[in-house]
A protein has these predicted regions:
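Short, low-complexity N-terminal leaders and the immediately following helix N-cap/first helix
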Residues: 1-88
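Flexible, glycine/charged-enriched surface loops at secondary-structure junctions
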Residues: 55-56, 81-86, 144-146, 204-208, ...
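Extended, charged alpha/beta regions that create polyanion-binding interfaces
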Residues: 59-167
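Glycine-rich phosphate/diphosphate-binding loop of Rossmann-like nucleotide-binding domains
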Residues: 158-213, 217
Length: 342
């Protein structure tokens, strides 16, 4: 830091805020710390009584916070993301369309472990709407050594650590099982709930079949739905451990790869996820809670399925932390802790 005549300050970086006071109008910073002085600024600074300024001594090996923020932004920004103008060394990213926000946690941790810089984001695997804020970046000091930003540039060269996956239009088949529905003892109130949730992501039910508790019929129905071009199959009913509940066996007998039967999520513990064939078409067994609980495991899984984002058994297991829905009177999901473990 050094003192310099204001008339010679063009191109220099301010070390402190410069306050402008106009009685009855304003008392606020006219120029912020970190501002790069321009020729046009000099008359204004002089009118504020600033004949001398404290400025940073620029060095060839130093980067201003705005320049460093650009490097951090490049490490983050991907297709479908808009960025703000750099302001006081900070850049924010926002979603240009609805989609599934993804983040490479390992590379994010690498950057934030370097010191003197930070990237803060919303949770990954979160559905977002157009215009939602995604992340912000900045360095901590006003200037930083260029060599400290080199690891960030290397990470950026590997590709952005964030992505925004678009939802795909999908055709869904719903297979309702249960003697009580098949024989007309009760009304099917499950399918309308599924239909509403699918509409939110642009999916349509193109086939709906009601079957008794017979695993062979359910297996045949799943395979036929796949032959008809279903891009996901949702099986409702028959997912618990009662003798009449045969849906898990029916899905297994299709030859699909069972990723998990059961998940550490409440509501939703009896959920089943499988993928069929080389196209990895998702088949799901939905527990009864999906019908009556406001948010369940289905609300965590569906955005990823709609974005063609494969789910592993390990990821499902990681949902245990944060997998307990508190059933708040006013639901704020996804802006809450539910389902943020993966």
């Amino acid at each position: 830091m050094k003192q310099i005549e204001t008339k010679k300050a063009a191109g220099m970086v301010l070390c402190h805020d410069i306050t402008q006071i106009i009685r009855g109008v304003t008392k606020d910073a006219r120029f912020r710390k970190g501002h790069i002085v321009t020729e046009e600024d000099i008359p204004v600074l002089l009118s504020l009584g600033k004949d001398h300024l404290y400025v940073w001594e620029a060095g060839e090996n130093m980067l201003h916070e705005n320049d460093a923020a650009e490097i951090l932004c490049r490490a983050c920004q991907n297709a479908g993301m808009s960025r703000s103008e750099v302001k006081e060394g900070k850049i924010e990213l926002s979603a240009e369309h609805d989609g599934l926000f993804k983040i490479d946690k390992e590379r994010l941790l690498r950057i934030n472990s370097l010191g003197q810089m930070m990237i803060a984001s919303r949770h990954g695997n979160t559905p977002v709407k157009k215009g939602d804020k995604l992340a912000g970046t900045r360095i901590i000091p006003l200037v930083i050594e260029k060599e400290k930003m080199e690891p960030v540039e290397q990470i950026a060269n590997e590709g952005p650590i964030m992505s925004l996956l678009s939802y795909q239009t999908k055709k869904a088949a719903v297979i309702t099982t249960g003697n009580e529905v098949y024989f007309g003892r009760i009304k099917d109130t499950f399918t309308p709930v599924i239909e509403e949730k699918l509409k939110e992501y642009g999916a349509n039910i193109t086939e709906h079949i009601v079957l008794p508790d017979d695993h062979t019929q359910v297996t045949r129905a799943v395979l036929k739905a796949l032959e008809h071009g279903a891009q996901m199959v949702l099986c409702t009913g028959g997912m618990s451990v009662d003798p009449d509940d045969q849906t898990p066996l029916a899905i297994k007998n299709t030859g699909a790869e069972i990723i998990s039967y059961g998940a550490p999520v409440l509501p939703g513990a009896m959920f089943l996820l499988a993928y069929y064939g080389k196209d990895r078409i998702p088949i799901m067994g939905l527990p009864g809670c999906v019908m009556y609980s406001q948010k369940t495991i289905f609300d965590l899984i569906l955005p990823r399925v709609m974005a063609d984002d494969p789910i592993t058994a390990r990821e499902l297991a990681s949902l245990g932390e944060g997998g307990f829905c508190l059933g708040c009177e006013v639901c704020t999901y996804p802006n809450c802790g539910f389902g943020k473990g993966w």
